[in-house]
């Protein structure tokens, strides 16, 4: 049997430097003392403060003390090393945001949104990540308003942001791409310390993504462009895909996919004066409901999106600030794949109890049916609350260690 602890230090150093995820590096360093000594812990990313986005040529908040703080989150798939029973072989999805002030302390969030759930009493104060199989499925970046207005406007900026860090000898130079309130693309380059809003906009943009080292953006019609962060020029790489109401870009198995969400407007039932009220306040009395999805695969040489008719083992996840994918055989062995998970108006107001309720839905790509995840126990256990093998003291010991993340 090979003694892995005797691998050359230069080879271990090369392997450790190729691990982008801090969670992968934690598990690498926990193998043995020689691996631990060969790899330094990742330095936390510095706190980036960005000026406020311009609004039609001027700042929304003229006070220079107001701006954005950029934070990074990781979406993790956590599984037990050796499930006690077959039903425990499923994974648990969670989003973590590292505390910038307290090392190894993290905030636990819903993987598809920013919901922060109450921690159960039996949840360990310190979670030793070396006790589990941990895989990073995706990352996301969030722009938070800070200072003068604080939490009051925290939720005003809802658009997705993607970031590319440049290899500049530890200077942490980066480029950020997001969608301006006008629907145009906005770019921030750290060395310029300024925003640029790109005026090209045949249709408002729906999503942005970093794929294969390049920035991609798709508009509401499916027109897809690559954004050159040096010249700030856009290059058309795929013609429009008409039909749906909201487009999502997602990477899966090394390919870029386009997920097209179809919505339907439904009237909310009311008293006899309901019809008159609808005409007076149409937005208030209409409810958007997700009815179906279509999926396309990007073929760059043809500059087009090609229909995907079967997702096979794939499970696609559409979050508010990121998208990611996984295989059913890995994340949920007892279930089929070919599904799309999403945040949105799953059913009408009567089904959910309130017109504006939002919940987690799943679309079966083969049958075309949409269900609430909470009605499907086999899918619901992927999400909050944490599974028994997380909260069990037999697997999650309450002690402090370098491989631990404090929740």
Curated annotation (Swiss-Prot):
Any GO BP annotation:
protein ubiquitination
Task: Locate the coiled-coil region(s) and give their ranges.
Answer: none
Q: Where is the F-box domain?
A: 2-50
This protein's UniProt keywords: Nucleus, Ubl conjugation pathway
- Positions of disulphide bridges: none
This protein's pathway reads: Protein modification; protein ubiquitination
Annotated compartments: Nucleus
SMART domains in the record: FBOX (SM00256)
Cite a GO CC annotation: nucleus
| Gene3D superfamilies, sorted | 1.20.1280.50
Principal location class: nucleus
- PANTHER family, sorted: F-BOX PROTEIN SKIP23
Subunit details: Part of a SCF (ASK-cullin-F-box) protein ligase complex. Interacts with SKP1A/ASK1.
Q: What does this protein do?
A: Component of SCF(ASK-cullin-F-box) E3 ubiquitin ligase complexes, which may mediate the ubiquitination and subsequent proteasomal degradation of target proteins.
Q: What is known of its domains?
A: The F-box is necessary for the interaction with ASK proteins.
Q: What is the name of this protein?
A: F-box protein SKIP23
What gene name is given for the protein in this entry? Answer: SKIP23
């Amino acid at each position: 049997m090979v003694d892995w602890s005797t691998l050359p230090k230069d080879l271990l150093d090369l392997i450790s430097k190729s691990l982008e995820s801090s969670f992968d590096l934690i598990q690498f360093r926990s193998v043995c003392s020689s691996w631990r000594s060969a790899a330094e812990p990742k330095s936390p990313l510095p706190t980036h403060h960005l000026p406020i986005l311009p609004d039609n040529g001027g700042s929304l908040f003229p006070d220079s003390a107001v701006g954005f703080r950029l934070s990074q989150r990781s979406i993790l798939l956590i599984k037990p090393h050796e499930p006690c029973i077959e039903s425990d072989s499923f994974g648990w999805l969670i989003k973590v945001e590292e505390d910038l002030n307290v090392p190894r302390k993290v905030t636990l969030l819903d993987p598809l949104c920013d919901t922060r759930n109450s921690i159960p009493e039996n949840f360990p104060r310190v979670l030793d990540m070396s006790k589990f199989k941990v895989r990073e499925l995706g990352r996301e970046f969030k722009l938070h308003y800070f200072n003068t207005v604080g939490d009051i406007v925290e939720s005003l900026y809802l658009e997705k942001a993607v970031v590319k860090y440049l290899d500049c000898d530890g200077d942490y130079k980066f480029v950020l791409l997001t969608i301006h309130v006008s629907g145009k693309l906005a770019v921030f380059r750290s060395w310029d310390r300024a925003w640029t809003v790109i005026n090209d906009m045949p249709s408002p943009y729906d999503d942005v993504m970093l794929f294969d080292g390049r920035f991609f953006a798709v508009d509401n019609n499916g027109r897809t462009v690559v954004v050159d962060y040096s010249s700030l020029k856009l290059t058309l790489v795929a013609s429009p895909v008409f039909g749906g109401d909201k487009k999502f870009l997602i990477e899966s198995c090394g390919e870029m996919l386009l997920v097209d969400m179809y919505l339907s407007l439904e009237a909310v039932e009311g008293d006899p004066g309901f019809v008159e009220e609808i005409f007076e306040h149409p937005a208030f009395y209409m409810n958007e409901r997700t009815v179906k999805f279509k999926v396309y695969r990007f073929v760059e040489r043809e500059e087009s999106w090609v229909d995907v008719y079967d997702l096979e083992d794939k499970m696609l996840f559409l979050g508010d600030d990121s998208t990611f994918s996984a295989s059913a055989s890995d994340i949920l062995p007892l279930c089929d794949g070919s599904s799309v998970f999403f945040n949105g108006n799953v059913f009408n107001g009567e089904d959910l109890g309130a017109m504006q309720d939002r919940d987690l839905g799943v679309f079966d790509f083969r049958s075309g049916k949409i269900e609430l995840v909470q009605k499907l126990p086999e899918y619901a256990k992927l999400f909050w609350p944490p599974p028994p093998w997380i909260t069990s003291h037999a697997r999650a010991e309450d002690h402090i260690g370098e491989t631990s993340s404090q929740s």
